[in-house]
A protein has these predicted regions:
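Active-site acidic carboxylates
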Residues: 1-104
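A short glycine-rich beta-strand->turn/loop micro-motif centered on a GG-aromatic cluster
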Residues: 133-140, 157-171
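A general structural motif
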Residues: 20-22, 60, 127-132, 161
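Active-site-proximal beta-strand/loop segments in catalytic clefts of secreted hydrolases
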Residues: 66-69, 108, 137, 167-169
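Internal catalytic-core helix/loop-beta-alpha segment
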Residues: 87-145
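Alpha-helix termini
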Residues: 16, 123-127, 153-161
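Histidine-anchored nucleotide/phosphate-binding helix
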Residues: 50-58, 144-157
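Charged helix-capping and loop-helix junction motifs
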Residues: 44-47, 119-120, 148-149
C-alpha cells in the first residue's frame, strides 16, 4: 500500500479565499432533490450549505451551479430511483443558495464532466481560470467523478497552471 509522506500532506494545507488565483467555483447538485426532499435526499448534505455560501461571498468570483436534471424517462433511473426530474422542484437550486446563482448547467448523469454545457466551458472558458473549486454533493459519486475526470483532462492537455480545490467543509 502506498503511504502519503509528511511533505505531501504539508503541501495541501488549508487555503483562504484570498489565496485563490483566478478562481471559478462549481456548486454541484445543491438542489432540492438531494438536500430537502425526494427519493435521494439526505438532510446531512445541508450542513455544507453555510460553508458554500461563505466561500461564495468571500471569494466574490465566478460561480457556476450544476443541477442534476433528468427527463421523465432516463437511463439513470435503471440504477437509481426517479429523482430531480426536469421541471420539478427537486431539480432546482436550494433556496439558501438561489441568490448566488450566476450561471446554471443542467446534467443528465452523475458526472458534470460529461455535461454538454461543461464541455463547452472546457473549450471556451477553462483557460480563463487557474483555480477550479468544486463544492456540493455527493462526494462518493458526483464530486468524485467530476474531479477525477477534470484532473485527467488537465493532465492530458498539460494544463500545469490549473489546480482543482475541494474544500472539505463544502462537500
Amino acid at each position: 500500500m502506498a503511504r502519503v509522506s509528511k511533505q505531501f500532506l504539508e503541501a495541501y494545507k488549508p487555503l483562504s479565499t484570498k489565496e485563490l488565483k483566478d478562481p471559478v467555483i462549481f456548486v454541484v447538485d445543491m438542489i432540492e432533490g438531494f438536500v430537502h426532499e425526494g427519493a435521494l435526499h439526505d438532510e446531512e448534505i445541508n450542513a455544507a450549505t453555510v460553508h458554500i455560501e461563505a466561500l461564495i461571498r468571500d471569494a466574490e468570483q465566478r460561480v457556476i451551479f450544476i443541477a442534476d436534471s433528468h427527463p421523465p424517462k432516463t437511463r439513470e433511473f435503471n440504477s437509481y430511483p426517479s429523482h430531480c426530474v426536469i421541471g420539478t422542484k427537486e431539480s432546482e437550486v436550494i433556496q439558501e443558495l438561489q441568490p448566488y446563482v450566476q450561471e446554471l448547467m443542467r446534467k443528465n448523469s452523475t458526472n458534470t464532466f460529461t455535461c454538454p454545457d461543461f464541455q463547452s466551458f472546457l473549450t471556451e472558458r477553462m483557460d480563463s481560470y487557474r483555480d477550479i473549486v468544486i463544492t456540493g454533493c455527493c462526494t462518493d459519486i458526483c464530486i468524485l467523478q467530476f474531479a477525477l475526470c477534470l484532473n485527467a483532462w488537465l493532465n492530458e492537455h498539460n494544463k500545469t497552471d490549473q489546480r482543482i480545490i475541494i474544500p472539505l467543509s463544502c462537500v
